[in-house]
């Protein structure tokens, strides 16, 4: 036996033990995604820092806080693509960890100030804007949602609060509302405060809210948002049709003891129905599943398409409609709101879509 040969076996065993204790990485790469995802995601969604969105991880399983500029990233910890970031893994790009970097792009000029591509700024307390390759996109920091009339608040109105940036909705007697103007008119006027759009030489700051939740938990409903993405740069309300899931067989799945099924795709082609009209084309939409543990599943990533409907007497009409890409199950379930969950009336102002 060679000198020192008796120590080689323990060293080899130690190296083997270290490799066994690190199964999550192979040659600098993360282990493949687990299939199925069930059981590995936290029950509650992550609490991200202000301005940091929650996105699905690289496996499409769990919500994680998007990594910001200069932070480490990986397929399971993606960068904030909405902020113009990408995961720079170096020249080899082996699929392992990297650093979130800003995509190259043009700078933006607003109110005499130059902002770099991907840079976020606040022109006022009401708006947060981002420079994206020479274009400025802004989102309101205040809640621009409508407070619809209901039994408890038949005449809502938005007012300014001293010492606070954002307006608040209040409920006042009918006489005071009639003296002060209609609630919708007050809302439309105040929604453009803080940005002077009268100067045609100034940039029109894009302001678009997120789509509201679908008005029905099953069957055809509608959702709304407020935007000024038009030539007049005026705040208008947009509405689209939506269907989270069909109403028939609305039972939580107990397949192999699973508590939730986030997203499921229709096995057969279906036609959407809107009042007495039927979609011309057939679709295989994705629906949000149900849970039997008290959580609810809602759309996480969606897109809007134009659906053509065939109506009685040979008439045709087109309506924007939400299609679901992915859903997420969580405990922050929407509360019942009788003023919001109303039948979709095609003659009402809410149904002008």
From Swiss-Prot:
Glycan attachment residues as annotated in the record: 276
GO biological process annotation, one example: negative regulation of monocyte chemotaxis
Residue intervals of the CTCK domain: 260-334
InterPro entries per the UniProt record, alphabetical: CCN, Cys_knot_C, Glyco_hormone_CN, Growth_fac_rcpt_cys_sf, IGFBP-like, IGFBP_CNN, Insulin_GF-bd_Cys-rich_CS, TSP1_CCN
Source superkingdom: Eukaryota
Residue ranges occupied by any IGFBP N-terminal domain in the UniProt entry: 29-103
Single GO cellular component term: extracellular space
Domain VWFC: 106-172
Domain TSP type-1: 203-248
Disulphide linkage map: 33-59, 37-61, 41-62, 48-65, 73-87, 79-100, 260-297, 277-311, 288-327, 291-329, 296-333
Compartments, as annotated in UniProt: Secreted; Cytoplasm; Cell junction, Gap junction
Signal peptide interval: 1-26
MF annotations from Gene Ontology: growth factor activity; heparin binding; hormone activity; integrin binding; Notch binding
Keywords: Cell junction, Cytoplasm, Disulfide bond, Gap junction, Glycoprotein, Growth factor, Proto-oncogene, Secreted, Signal
Functional description taken from the UniProt entry: Immediate-early protein likely to play a role in cell growth regulation.
Family recorded in the similarity comment: Belongs to the CCN family.
Name of the featured protein: CCN family member 3
Organism: Coturnix japonica
